[in-house]
Amino acid sequence: MQILRFSDLCAQGQARGQRVFIRADLNVPQDDDGRITEDTRIRASVPCIRMALDAGAAVMVTSHLGRPTEGTLTPADSLAPVAARLSELLGCDVPLVADWVDGVQVQPGQVVLLENCRVNVGEKKNTPELAQKMAKLCDIYVNDAFGTAHRAEGTTYGIAEYAKVACAGPLLSAEIDAIGKALSQPARPLAAIVAGSKVSTKLTILKSLSDKVDQLIVGGGIANTFMLAAGLSIGKSLAEPDLVSEAKAVIEAMKARGAEVPIPTDVVVAKTFSADAPATVKAATDVADDDLILDIGPQTAAKLAAQLKAAGTIVWNGPVGVFEFPAFENGTKAIAQAIAESPAFSIAGGGDTLAAIAKYGIEKDVGYISTGGGAFLEVLEGKTLPAFEILHKRANG
């Protein structure tokens, strides 16, 4: 996808002395006392801000935090803790500016944090009045927030329509490149792992991927519904019997293309859903009426691992079992290790997937780890994200 990149503007000296407005994703979790409990997103925003400062720009940064009521800023909605953390990471003062829509004082070489953008009236609905006011604040607009790229809001879309220059920051550029590499021009075979508790939440993804991928590996509650579609008994496992026909349609669509949905041949079951429930490996044809399927079995895990090691590209969204329980983590662990050992380009995303990657320490062995939950899922659904669309439009005339 052709877009203007902020790194190129900086390299060409076009940001010197310019007012740069960066939309970052600084929406971090906090405890009841307002202390930041996990700062990955803040750390991830630093390279773009530093790039702008090093280029001699006057830098404004904003983000949303939570879901505030438009027009009202409460202490809980304030970016004050984020400003403090940013100043530590950047090694310079980062003043926090409230009521900033009508004007911001900032000099080249300085950075200010503009208070929670979702407090501004018109942000969520992307009103032209707000977008035009924000565009007047800057010479260059930079979107570096992939996590909100699927939302057409004032700071993610509207401002990009009216700003003199609209471009992508390093984080957003990396996401665009990785997604293109995995889905637009993938090295074959292309394997996708789509797992989770419900087919209903991922049905669009399953359908979209079924005409692109060579192997569509399903896991978790989704796999149980596919096992029902294949005529297997799943006992009292979590599934959606009303979506069996949809699962069958995905299986048939894949088969018609010479591709496959590998159905588990063995599973790990228990009688209750608990960490200390005795785990039993069974053939997929031997599941009893009172069994709960909580993981794929070793035979299935080995087969899938072999497929992943032979893949050219891997897309991973979701653990294949209840990996939080040691007795039912082996399937997800085997998948994670196979991805780590595979020469394939891999892209992974989604909260549980990131937790599994961290648990098995394979961060450095995954080609690209996507930070955007909902945005990543919409890409897998085959949608063009609003933030990508407007930057592409601006870059092409």
UniProtKB/Swiss-Prot annotation:
Its EC number is 2.7.2.3. One of its GO terms (biological process) is gluconeogenesis. Belongs to the phosphoglycerate kinase family. It is found in: Cytoplasm. PROSITE patterns: PGLYCERATE_KINASE. Monomer. One of its GO terms (cellular component) is cytosol. The gene is pgk. It catalyses: (2R)-3-phosphoglycerate + ATP = (2R)-3-phospho-glyceroyl phosphate + ADP. Its main location: cytoplasm. GO terms for molecular function: ADP binding; ATP binding; phosphoglycerate kinase activity. The keyword Nucleotide-binding applies. This is Phosphoglycerate kinase. The keyword Cytoplasm applies. It comes from Paracidovorax citrulli (strain AAC00-1). Substrate binds at residues 25-27, 41, 64-67, 118, 151.
